């Protein structure tokens, strides 16, 4: 018999943490204690869906997003009711499913679904700790102790790391973080802004700067010169692809390219092929030798990201107009250093076949993407204790498909899970809504098994009769 109720502590209360909490509330059917640790007031939103700007749109269609496993149309149904269209208008319902709604609206949906899930479980004890977890230590035979700066420590049977990218928001280049608060008048006065990276974050910053009054030139630096592609005009049915059985990433890349070309020849958008690959990507990734995975990361990742992480058509059109009108310029090269000056920023750029050059800008933003911070105290403490290990590429932590963290010598750490982007190095396709929800659901099912009371043994039953 337990001295205290079975306790699950979810560290991180953005989208990933909300998905983990909702899944546990769905699957763990015994009374338990749920602790959610999140210092931000934007519960359920996180960085991804915390924007309050109505023109910051989701990069996935409404019909494809849901925080509830097995209910793919949940966000669409919720949004339809919010827009007060009445669910009997099937045509409007279908049309809404193909749209890209504001991220703020999705954040509201996640937050509401989280509190609804809590409300449906009067048998649980829910606690919100408005702080970031500082340390997680193992207590032999008693689970884990989660420590905070000021709040009382929490003893937990299960700890789920759901900090998305581990609280790291830039690569430490010296440039501004992508969503760092910059007064609008600074954009209005700026003649040049420089953006390191050419993915979705760059698009947010560039178009946001325009909305805030920036009228000057934008310099976009990209090692491979790739920009995000556009979604198809309407949602496409994912197309199953028979790829060659190969442990070489070059063969797989060729197979994907040929499949996209054949789809287009048959009148099917290439986006259907990319969408069809998503479910099988973790298996494909794990089937590659580490050296081949590293080759993909060095050479092919920018091309994959440009086709996988796409833009709504209207946003893509605005981006293309920036370059067509020469208000923005794409420079292929590698940033070797960023220095703050009295006038702004000096960025050292190395382009192929040229000597290093210095570019000057009034503002410089690191848009190279979020990445896990494996050196933050929380993660470092786990690795030093042998409870966790970085994956082979140091993109995150080594995990099993369910998210159970692998510690020293590849041994699973009982009761310790990571969900979402912290698992990217192991599972690869684990940064988008559907994949995070599926992984959270798998983890919650495993947790439910450990939470269930043990069946009495035959000997105990016989002795009591």
Placement of each model-derived feature along the sequence:
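Flavin (primarily FAD) cofactor-binding/catalytic cores of flavoenzymes
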Residues: 1-41, 45-47, 90-246, 256-451, ...
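N-terminal glycine-rich dinucleotide-binding loop that anchors FAD/FMN and/or NAD(P) in oxidoreductases
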Residues: 52-76, 236-251, 314-317
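Dinucleotide-binding Rossmann-like beta1-alpha1 core, especially the glycine-rich loop
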Residues: 53-69, 73, 87-107, 114
């Amino acid at each position: 018999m337990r001295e205290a109720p079975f306790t699950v502590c979810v560290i991180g209360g953005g989208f990933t943490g909300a998905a983990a909490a909702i899944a546990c509330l769905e699957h763990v059917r015994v009374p338990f204690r749920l602790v959610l640790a999140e210092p931000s007031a934007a519960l359920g939103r996180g960085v991804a869906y915390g924007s309050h700007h109505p023109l910051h749109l989701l990069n996935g269609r409404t019909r494809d997003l849901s925080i509830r496993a097995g209910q793919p149309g949940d966000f669409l149904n919720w949004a339809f009711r919010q827009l007060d269209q009445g669910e009997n208008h099937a045509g409007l319902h279908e049309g809404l499913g193909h749209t890209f709604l504001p991220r703020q609206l999705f954040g509201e949906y996640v937050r509401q679904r989280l509190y609804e899930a809590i409300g449906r479980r009067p048998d649980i004890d829910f606690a919100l700790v408005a702080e970031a977890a500082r340390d997680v230590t193992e207590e032999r035979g008693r689970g884990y102790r989660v420590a905070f700066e000021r709040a009382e420590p929490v003893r937990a049977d299960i700890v789920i790391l759901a900090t998305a990218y581990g609280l790291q928001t830039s690569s430490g280049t010296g440039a501004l973080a992508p969503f760092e608060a910059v007064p609008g008048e600074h954009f209005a006065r700026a003649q040049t802004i420089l953006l390191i990276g050419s993915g979705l974050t760059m698009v947010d910053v560039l178009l946001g700067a325009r909305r805030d009054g920036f009228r000057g030139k934008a310099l976009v630096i990209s090692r491979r010169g790739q920009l995000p592609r556009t979604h198809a005009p309407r949602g496409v049915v994912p197309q199953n692809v028979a790829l060659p059985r190969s442990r070489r990433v070059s063969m797989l890349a060729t197979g994907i390219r040929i499949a996209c070309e054949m789809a287009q020849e048959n009148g099917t958008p290439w986006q259907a092929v990319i969408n069809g690959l998503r479910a099988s990507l973790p298996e494909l990734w794990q089937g590659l030798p580490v050296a081949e995975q590293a080759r993909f990361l060095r050479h092919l990742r920018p091309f994959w990201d440009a086709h996988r992480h796409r833009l709504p058509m209207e946003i893509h059109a605005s981006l293309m107009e920036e370059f067509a009108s020469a208000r923005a310029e794409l420079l292929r090269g590698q940033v070797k250093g960023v220095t703050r000056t009295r006038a702004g920023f000096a960025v050292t750029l190395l382009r192929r076949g040229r000597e290093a050059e210095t570019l000057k800008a009034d503002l410089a933003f690191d848009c190279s993407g979020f990445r896990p911070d494996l050196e933050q105290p929380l993660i470092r403490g786990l690795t030093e204790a042998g409870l966790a290990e970085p994956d082979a590429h140091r993109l995150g932590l080594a995990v099993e498909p369910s998210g159970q963290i692998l510690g020293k010598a590849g041994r699973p750490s009982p009761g310790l899970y990571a969900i979402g982007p912290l698992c990217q190095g192991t599972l690869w396709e684990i940064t988008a809504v559907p994949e995070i929800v599926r992984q959270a659901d798998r983890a919650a099912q495993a947790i439910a098994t450990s939470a269930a009371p043990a069946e009495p043994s035959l000997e105990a039953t016989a002795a009591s009769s």
